[in-house]
Amino acid sequence: MRSSLSAAALLAALITPLAAQDHADNVAPGGGAVPSGWIVRADRGDAKNAKVASMGQGLHLTLGPAIILYRSDTQGSGPFHTLATFTQTKPSEHAEGYGLFVGGQGLDGAAQKYIYFLVRQDGSYLIKRRDGEKTSDVSKGWVQHAAVKKPDAKGSATNLLEVDNKRDPSKLAFLVNGQEVYGTDAKGMALDGIVGIRANHNLDLHVEGFGVHR
């Protein structure tokens, strides 16, 4: 009995670090670099292992930690529409989400709040609220949808994401590649605030066409 317990304990000790390594943040060479005017906040710790660079007509993100990326002057208030085109340049080891956030408040403190809309490489989308350290579902978890493009034969996927409160101010619509995947009553959604980009850890992304239209 004693030897069997010892073997089990040894196995657990070996498995646990390996499982932790599976979800560890990658090392991003040149991490900590951010174009002027942009602000990066990591979910955990600091953003020294996240690299954001101007590239072509957009931004290129090479990530260790999950982050939000925004400009303090990019606000959505009243009816507005925001969009960006995201190219995941290569598949991640685990399916990780990327997309937009709206209604950002207190983003530099512990009481941060925002609503985020993500897609990921398995062809699904997610909409959630963040309130400090807590998050809650708007959509029913990750939802499969044919509008979300999966990686092609070369391993890359390009998706245009939009959050639209302008076309119908009573409604908040979430679109992928021009197709509405989710819509809800805008009342009570706390939309006023900073609009920006959210990307989970270990992703390599190119972002173009980010903008807010009122």
State what each model feature region is.
Residues 7-17:
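Bacterial N-terminal signal peptides
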